[in-house]
Every structure is written in structure tokens, then in C-alpha cells.
Amino acid sequence: MEKIRLKLKAYDHRVLDRSVVAIVEAVKRSGSEIRGPIPLPTKNKRYTVLRSPHVNKDSREQFEIRVYSRLIDIISATPETVDSLMKLDLAPEVDVEVTSMETK
């Protein structure tokens, strides 16, 4: 039996949630057991930039990028499950990291 772990990341949580729903539906149609989606903590990156290129250090702008993450575990994955996941057309903004584990 094989266990597949999917870790999805995106800057927009709405696009991420749409992709998660598509993955969950595809896995359920193939008959595999699924755990998740588990929301992981949001990572915030803040950048402070001077507005002026020369003087006025007191005048600054702050920008923030948020990275949203979800975790999905597919228990007892079948070849049909893998085929349905490969055929999915997910949004290009979503980064998918796939890890395969062998279970006893």
C-alpha cells in the first residue's frame, strides 16, 4: 500500500481552496481514502522600502506577501488515483509538492 502526501502552496487562498476541492473530488471518485485538507500556518514576509531613492529615511513603504499552505494525505493510493491526479488541471499559481511513502 502506498501513501501520498500533497503539500500545496499559493499566494491567494481562494485559488488554493479551489485546487484543494478539485483534488479531493478526484481522489474520492477513484475510491481512495483521504485525510485533510489540513490548513498549515500562513507565512508572512514583510519588506520595508525607502520611498525616495536619495533622502527622507523617515518616509518608507511596507509590503507584505502571504503564503497559504494546505496538506492532504491520500491513504492506500491506487494507480487509478495517481492517474486522476495527473490529469487534473490546477491553477498555475498553486505550487504542489508530492511525497510518496510506502506503508506496511
Curated annotation (Swiss-Prot):
- InterPro entries from the UniProt entry: Ribosomal_uS10 (IPR001848), Ribosomal_uS10_CS (IPR018268), Ribosomal_uS10_dom (IPR027486), Ribosomal_uS10_dom_sf (IPR036838)
Q: Which domain of life is it from?
A: Bacteria
Per UniProt, the keywords (alphabetical) are:
Ribonucleoprotein, Ribosomal protein
What is one term from the GO cellular component aspect held by the record? ribosome
- SMART domains this protein is in? Ribosomal_S10
One GO process term, biological-process aspect? translation
Q: GO molecular-function annotation terms?
A: structural constituent of ribosome; tRNA binding
State the family it belongs to. Answer: Belongs to the universal ribosomal protein uS10 family.
What is the protein's known function? Involved in the binding of tRNA to the ribosomes.
- Alphabetized PANTHER family for the sequence: 30S RIBOSOMAL PROTEIN S10 FAMILY MEMBER
Complexes and interactors? Part of the 30S ribosomal subunit.
Query: Mind telling me what this protein is named?
Result: Small ribosomal subunit protein uS10
Native source organism of the sequence: Helicobacter pylori (strain G27)
